[in-house]
C-alpha cells in the first residue's frame, strides 16, 4: 500500500435540493468514518448543518461555509491538507475540484486529488471529451455534438434530426436539460441549459427514447482491479431521468448475453478512464437488435451508488474512500461477512425496488410530466423476495396515503382515453394508471407495453397483483369465515401466505373484505402466517454474516435469531 496521507479535505454536497437528496450525506458520512479508521485527519467543508456528516464526531474539523471554490481555496490555505476528496459530494464536489485545479490552488499548496484525477473528471463530465474518448476506446455513443450557442444547437439538431436530447455539462439531475421536439423548444431548452452549465456548454444528442435504460455500479482500485457491485434497471425506458424512474436491482429482464455484454463494457470503460473508486455507468439497450449506447459515466459516488450500496450491503462510499488513500480492493475487509474482501462481487437473492418521491402533493398545479430533468425530492427503497412484494412495500413507504399498488377512485372512473394518455406520457401516476387499465380490462399487457415502452415483464407483474386482488374478492366468503372462526384448511392458509408474499398489506386485504385491519392480522397470526426475516449479507448466504441487516418477507424459513 502507498504512503497514506495525514490530512484529507472532504467536500460535502451542500443543501438538499431537487435532484440531490440525502444520499450524498450518507456517502460522505461513510467516507469520514472510513478515513478516520485508517488514522487520517479529516477536514470537512459543507454548507448544510442539518446533515449527519457535519456532526461533531464525524470529522476532526468541520467548516460550515458556502460551497464555493474561492472559499474552499482559503480553507486549503489554512489547513494545508495532503489530499482533497471531491468524489463524495455529488456534482458540487467535482465542479469545485475542477475549478480549484484551473485556479492553480491545488498545485500551489501541493494538494493531491485523491481517487479519481481531475483529468478523468473532465474526461467524463465534458461532453465533447467524453464522446471523443468513448469513440477512441471503441464504445458506442449516441450521435451528438457539444455546442455553446443556440445557433450551433440548431445546426446540430437539423443534422441529427428531431427530437433531440439537450444535456448541459457539469450539472446534476439533468438540471437545465430536456427533450426538444422542434426548433422553438430547442431554443428554450438550450438557453436554459447554457445558463446552468458551469462551462457554458450543452450536448445535443440523438434521442433513443423507448430503449431500455440499464445502469452498472462499478469499483476500481489504483492497481486496476475492477468489480461490478450490481446492475440496475429502470422500469421506464430512455427519455425519463434515472432519478425520476422506478428502478429495480438487480436488472430483471436482461438475457445472460446482454448482461455479460454490458458488464464487460462497464469494466472496460472504468479501466480505460482510470477511475479510482466508485463509478456509475448508464447504458441504453435496444431489445430487438441488441445494440447499446453509453449514455453517461459518473466518476463519483452518485444517487445510484447510494441505492446500490443499500441494495447489496456493499458500502461503496466507505470502500471508495479507502481506495482513494491507496488501499486495494483485496486489502479492504467486508465488514458484513468478516472473512471476504471488497474484491468479492456481491450476490443478491432478493429484489430491490426504488421509487422517487415527488412533491406534487405540495404543488398540485405543477406539471406532472416526467423527463430528463429531475423533479423528485427524494426516494424510497424496499426489499422483497419478488418484484411484486418489493414494489408494494415501496409504494407504502412513499407516505402518499396508498396502502399498496392500486388506482385512486378517480382513476377507476376516468375516461379510458385519459388513462391511455397517462400511460403513454411519463408521470408520477403512471404505474397506478397501468393498474387501473388492467383492473378495468381497458388494455392488454402487450398494448400497455407498446404504448408506454415499459418491458412486458414489468406489466405482467402488475397484472399478477391485479389478479391476486380479484382472487381475494372471489374468495371473500371463505376468507370472512376464516376471520370469524380463526380456523382454515391448508389451502386457505397457503393462499393467505401467497397474498402476503405478493406484497399485500393487512390494510389492503381488510379494505377488499370490508373488515378491520386488526382482524386480518389476528387471524393470519393464529394460523402461523407471519413475517420471516432474510439476510442482506452481500453473498447470498455463501458465507456466515457477522453484521448483516434484514428484510421481512413471508417464507417458511427465518434467518434471524429469535429471542423470546
Swiss-Prot record:
Domain ATP-grasp span(s) in chain numbering: 131-325
GO terms for biological process, alphabetical: 'de novo' UMP biosynthetic process; glutamine metabolic process; L-arginine biosynthetic process
GO cellular component, one term: cytoplasm
Annotated spans, Carboxyphosphate synthetic domain: 1-399
SMART domains with a match to the protein in the record: CPSase_L_D3
GO molecular function, one term: carbamoyl-phosphate synthase (ammonia) activity
Record-listed Mg(2+) 2 binding positions: 296, 298
Pathway: Amino-acid biosynthesis; L-arginine biosynthesis; carbamoyl phosphate from bicarbonate: step 1/1; Pyrimidine metabolism; UMP biosynthesis via de novo pathway; (S)-dihydroorotate from bicarbonate: step 1/3
Keywords tagged on the record: Amino-acid biosynthesis, Arginine biosynthesis, ATP-binding, Ligase, Magnesium, Manganese, Metal-binding, Nucleotide-binding, Pyrimidine biosynthesis, Repeat
Binding-site residues for ATP, renumbered to this chain: 127, 167, 173-174, 206, 208, 213, 239-241, 282, 296
Chain positions recorded as Mn(2+) 1 binding sites: 282, 296
EC number in record: 6.3.4.16, 6.3.5.5
The keyword Aminoacyl-tRNA synthetase is assigned to this record: no
Binding site for Mg(2+) 1: 282, 296
Spans annotated as Oligomerization domain: 400-560
Binding site for Mn(2+) 2: 296, 298
Free-text cofactor note: Binds 2 Mg(2+) or Mn(2+) ions per subunit.
Cofactor(s) the protein needs: Mg(2+); Mn(2+)
Catalytic activity from the UniProt record: hydrogencarbonate + L-glutamine + 2 ATP + H2O = carbamoyl phosphate + L-glutamate + 2 ADP + phosphate + 2 H(+); hydrogencarbonate + NH4(+) + 2 ATP = carbamoyl phosphate + 2 ADP + phosphate + 2 H(+)
Domain-level remarks: Corresponds to the N-terminal section. The large subunit is composed of 2 ATP-grasp domains that are involved in binding the 2 ATP molecules needed for carbamoyl phosphate synthesis. The N-terminal ATP-grasp domain (referred to as the carboxyphosphate synthetic component) catalyzes the ATP-dependent phosphorylation of hydrogencarbonate to carboxyphosphate and the subsequent nucleophilic attack by ammonia to form a carbamate intermediate.
Assembly mode: Composed of two chains; the small (or glutamine) chain promotes the hydrolysis of glutamine to ammonia, which is used by the large (or ammonia) chain to synthesize carbamoyl phosphate. Tetramer of heterodimers (alpha,beta)4.
Function of the protein: Large subunit of the glutamine-dependent carbamoyl phosphate synthetase (CPSase). CPSase catalyzes the formation of carbamoyl phosphate from the ammonia moiety of glutamine, carbonate, and phosphate donated by ATP, constituting the first step of 2 biosynthetic pathways, one leading to arginine and/or urea and the other to pyrimidine nucleotides.
Family in the record: Belongs to the CarB family.
Protein name: Carbamoyl phosphate synthase large chain, N-terminal section
Organism: Methanopyrus kandleri (strain AV19 / DSM 6324 / JCM 9639 / NBRC 100938)
Upper lineage: Archaea, Methanobacteriati, Methanobacteriota, Methanomada group, Methanopyri
Gene from which this protein is expressed: carB1
Amino acid at each position: 500500500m502507498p504512503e497514506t496521507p495525514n490530512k484529507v479535505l472532504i467536500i460535502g454536497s451542500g443543501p438538499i435540493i431537487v435532484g440531490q437528496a440525502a444520499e450524498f450525506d450518507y456517502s460522505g458520512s461513510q467516507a469520514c468514518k472510513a478515513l478516520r479508521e485508517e488514522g487520517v485527519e479529516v477536514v470537512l467543508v459543507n454548507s448544510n448543518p442539518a446533515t449527519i456528516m457535519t456532526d461533531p464526531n464525524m470529522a476532526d474539523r468541520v467548516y460550515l461555509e458556502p460551497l464555493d471554490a474561492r472559499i474552499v481555496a482559503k480553507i486549503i490555505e489554512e489547513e494545508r491538507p495532503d489530499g482533497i476528496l471531491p468524489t463524495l459530494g455529488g456534482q458540487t464536489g467535482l465542479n469545485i475540484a475542477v475549478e480549484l485545479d484551473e485556479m492553480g490552488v491545488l498545485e500551489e499548496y501541493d494538494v493531491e486529488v485523491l481517487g479519481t484525477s481531475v483529468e478523468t473528471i473532465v474526461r467524463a463530465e465534458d461532453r465533447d471529451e467524453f464522446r471523443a474518448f468513448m469513440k477512441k476506446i471503441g464504445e458506442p455513443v449516441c450521435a451528438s455534438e457539444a455546442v455553446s450557442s443556440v445557433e450551433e444547437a440548431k445546426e446540430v439538431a437539423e443534422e441529427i434530426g428531431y427530437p433531440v436530447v439537450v444535456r448541459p455539462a457539469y450539472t446534476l439531475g439533468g438540471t437545465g436539460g430536456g427533450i426538444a421536439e422542434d426548433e422553438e423548444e430547442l431554443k428554450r431548452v438550450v438557453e436554459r441549459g447554457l445558463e446552468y452549465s458551469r462551462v457554458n456548454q450543452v450536448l445535443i444528442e440523438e434521442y433513443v427514447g423507448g430503449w431500455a435504460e440499464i445502469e452498472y455500479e462499478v469499483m476500481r482500485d489504483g492497481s486496476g482491479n475492477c468489480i461490478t457491485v450490481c446492475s440496475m434497471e429502470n422500469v421506464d425506458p430512455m427519455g425519463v431521468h434515472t432519478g425520476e424512474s422506478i428502478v429495480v436491482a438487480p436488472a430483471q429482464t436482461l438475457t445472460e448475453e446482454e448482461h455479460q455484454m454490458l458488464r464487460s463494457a462497464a469494466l472496460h470503460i472504468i479501466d480505460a478512464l482510470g477511475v479510482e473508486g466508485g463509478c456509475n455507468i448508464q447504458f441504453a439497450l435496444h431489445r430487438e437488435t441488441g445494440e447499446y449506447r453509453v449514455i453517461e459515466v459518473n466518476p463519483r459516488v452518485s444517487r445510484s451508488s447510494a441505492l446500490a450500496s443499500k441494495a447489496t450491503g456493499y458500502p461503496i462510499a466507505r470502500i471508495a474512500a479507502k481506495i482513494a488513500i491507496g488501499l486495494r480492493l483485496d486489502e479492504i475487509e467486508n465488514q458484513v461477512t468478516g472473512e471476504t474482501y471488497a474484491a468479492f462481487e456481491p450476490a443478491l437473492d432478493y429484489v430491490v425496488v426504488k421509487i422517487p418521491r415527488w412533491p406534487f402533493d405540495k404543488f398540485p398545479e405543477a406539471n406532472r410530466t416526467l423527463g430528463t430533468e429531475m423533479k423528485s425530492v427524494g426516494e424510497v427503497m424496499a426489499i422483497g423476495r419478488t418484484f411484486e412484494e418489493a414494489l408494494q412495500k415501496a409504494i407504502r413507504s412513499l407516505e402518499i396515503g396508498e396502502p399498496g399498488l392500486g388506482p385512486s377512485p378517480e382513476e377507476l372512473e376516468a375516461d379510458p382515453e385519459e388513462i391511455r394518455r397517462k400511460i403513454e406520457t411519463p408521470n408520477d401516476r403512471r404505474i397506478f394508471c397501468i393498474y387501473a387499465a388492467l383492473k378495468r380490462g381497458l388494455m392488454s399487457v402487450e398494448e400497455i407495453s407498446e404504448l408506454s415502452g415499459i418491458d412486458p415483464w414489468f406489466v405482467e407483474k402488475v397484472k399478477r397483483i391485479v389478479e391476486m386482488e380479484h382472487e381475494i374478492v372471489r374468495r371473500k366468503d371463505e376468507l370472512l369465515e376464516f376471520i370469524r372462526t380463526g380456523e382454515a384448511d391448508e389451502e386457505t392458509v397457503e393462499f393467505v401466505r401467497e397474498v402476503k408474499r405478493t406484497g399485500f398489506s393487512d390494510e389492503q386485504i381488510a379494505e377488499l373484505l370490508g373488515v378491520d385491519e386488526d382482524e386480518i392480522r389476528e387471524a393470519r397470526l393464529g394460523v402461523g402466517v407471519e413475517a420471516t426475516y432474510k439476510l442482506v449479507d452481500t453473498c447470498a448466504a455463501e458465507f456466515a454474516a457477522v453484521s448483516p441487516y434484514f428484510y421481512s418477507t413471508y417464507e417458511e424459513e427465518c434467518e434471524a435469531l429469535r429471542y423470546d
